[in-house]
Curated annotation (Swiss-Prot):
One Pfam family, short name: Defensin_4
Disulfide bonds: C38-C73, C40-C66, C56-C74
Protein name, UniProt field: Kappa-actitoxin-Avd4h
Any one GO cellular component localisation term in the record: extracellular region
Tissue-by-tissue expression: Experimental results show no expression in the ectodermal tissue from the distal and proximal tentacles, body wall, and oral disk. Since paralogs are expressed in this tissue, an expression of this toxin in this tissue is probable. The negative results could be explained by the very low abundance of EST sequences.
Signal peptide stretch: 1-19
Family: Belongs to the sea anemone type 3 (BDS) potassium channel toxin family.
Localization: Secreted; Nematocyst
Keywords of this entry: Cleavage on pair of basic residues, Disulfide bond, Hypotensive agent, Ion channel impairing toxin, Nematocyst, Neurotoxin, Potassium channel impairing toxin, Secreted, Signal, Toxin, Voltage-gated potassium channel impairing toxin
Lineage: Eukaryota, Metazoa, Cnidaria, Anthozoa, Hexacorallia
Organism: Anemonia viridis
Length: 77
């Protein structure tokens, strides 16, 4: 019983370490977390696709958008 409990504790600690490492890599991702590249008709640049959102999130400097139901493509500046 003690060996099984110790093994569960080791697995839990390893999961926490690997999860924290993955979060550090996410900070250096090529695009914003939660957004994927998208294109709208009539726009030359690439936008950020936000899945299952009705509006563009605040704090990213988005100034225009287009809808691809149920998603939204948001454009900065």
């Amino acid at each position: 019983m003690n060996k099984a409990l110790f093994l569960c504790l080791v697995v839990l600690c390893a999961a926490v370490v690997f999860a924290a490492e993955d979060l550090q890599k996410a900070k250096h991702a090529p695009f914003k977390r939660g957004a994927a590249p998208c294109f709208c008709p009539g726009k030359a640049d690439r936008g950020d696709l936000w899945i299952l959102r009705g509006t563009c999130p605040g704090g990213y400097g988005y100034t225009s958008n287009c809808y691809n139901w149920p998603n939204i493509c948001c454009y900065p500046h």
